[in-house]
Amino acid sequence: MNLKVLAVFVLCAILVVVTAERRGTETGGYKKDTLQDLKKRTHDCFDRYREAACTSDNIRLLCKTSAKYQINCKKSCGLC
């Protein structure tokens, strides 16, 4: 009986140590993920608008100020 209790205790201790070592964010760092970090990790990395329109928007700095262009010109705005 004591051997079973000891085995359960050891397994619980291992679980606690492994869980405590995990980092707090998806990227593995100690800082919180920002919205920009989440946008960079998107799986659909393409421009919904024409390439010329997205390039023009990037030049006019709309990529930094407009969520509309950040979503629709991900590749040209460098968000992925």
Swiss-Prot record:
UniProt KW Secreted keyword: yes
Record's subcellular location: Secreted; Nematocyst
Domain ShKT: 45-80
Similarity remark: Belongs to the sea anemone type 1 potassium channel toxin family. Type 1b subfamily.
This protein's UniProt keywords: Disulfide bond, Ion channel impairing toxin, Nematocyst, Neurotoxin, Potassium channel impairing toxin, Secreted, Signal, Toxin, Voltage-gated potassium channel impairing toxin
Protein name per Swiss-Prot or TrEMBL: U-actitoxin-Avd9b
Propeptide part(s) removed at maturation, as residue ranges: 21-39
Chain spans, region Crucial for binding to potassium channels: 68-69
GO molecular function ontology, one term from the record: toxin activity
Predominant cellular place of this UniProt entry's protein: secreted
Function: Inhibits voltage-gated potassium channels (Kv1/KCNA).
One GO CC term on file: nematocyst
Signal peptide (residue range): 1-20
Disulfide bonds: C45-C80, C54-C73, C63-C77
